[in-house]
Structure formats: C-alpha cells, structure tokens
C-alpha cells in the first residue's frame, strides 16, 4: 500500500481530498448536532448546498462509512441520515479545526484584504 501523500495513488491523500471538499465537513458537523436528520431538514440546515450536491455528498460519506442511510418502509418513504462511530471519531478533529478557524479568522480576513488590495 502506498503511504506517500505526494503519490496520486495514496489512499490517505484520497481520503483527505474527499473530506476536504466543499461540503463534507459541514454536513458531518450538521449531522452531529442531532441524532438523525431527514434529507429536507439537512438541506434547510445547509441552505446554500444544492439538492444534487447534498445527494452526492451524502452518498460519498456513506461510501466512506461516515454516514448511515436508513430507509423506513412507509408510504410515503422516509429516509434518515445519521453519523457512524467512525464519523464520531472524526468530530474532535473537526471541532479542533473550527476552533483554530475562530481563533485565526480575524487575522486571516485582514491578510486576505491586504493581499487583494496589493494585486494589480
């Protein structure tokens, strides 16, 4: 198994790329706020994600064993999403990233403005 993050075939690189996409961490964090959520509730909680992207993100998280999709045999059908133990083991790391972002956001925003102002 390749464990060199610079190698495009490295599984660690692939996992980090999937988690580092635009929506995965936000969806995981949102699902962590409650025991389970229906698709529509999740979509309302993350209003700027499209229906298609939420579907793709949930499928990817399910493939990676981070989200469980439960279909209830009812009419109309009811589907709920919840985090797995693997996702819960990731939460402290997500929370640490959020804390780091809060701690550094003002200086990062300041630096972005400086950089944007210096571009020609």
Q: What are these model-predicted stretches?
A:
Residues 14, 44, 56, 92, ...:
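Generic recognition of well-ordered alpha-helical segments
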